[in-house]
């Protein structure tokens, strides 16, 4: 379960076989590069977002709510019966099983949460664009970790005119696919209790 849910974000390094080579970059035209720069600018201009989501995987369908407060914060709440809460705050990603009362921490840099919450989002450096597709009203960008392409890939799908992130697909090192679709996203929302919403303090350590 943990690997499937983390795959909704990315594949953490070390989950698959050691990579033998770097990711192979896509052959991009000047128009492609211009569109990628526009998408980077869109992501960097995002401040806050709240959305319902649907997740499809070999384990079935899950749903929940995602909250983004850039830079630095992301919260993913799964609806019952999935007893999971994930919060990314600056350098840590917290995975909390609300049923088992177990908490796991990972560096944000080892998850794709960094793609959404970094101060400066770039489709280069640690990640490589390995495929780029354009249709009249949408874009699909496939990314792999530059130094570890065998750990999997993520494909981000954007609607255009107006630009918005619509869904993503993650394929892990074993070829397992996880699809996440955003439903009725709202942008520029105000989180009045942001300090609590995006806290990565282990819930097990809170004294009631």
Name each model-derived stretch.
Residues 46-48, 61-63, 69-71, 81, ...:
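Extracytoplasmic
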Residues 65-115, 178-179:
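An acidic-aromatic
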Residues 41-58:
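A short, Trp-centered hydrophobic/proline-enriched beta-strand micro-motif
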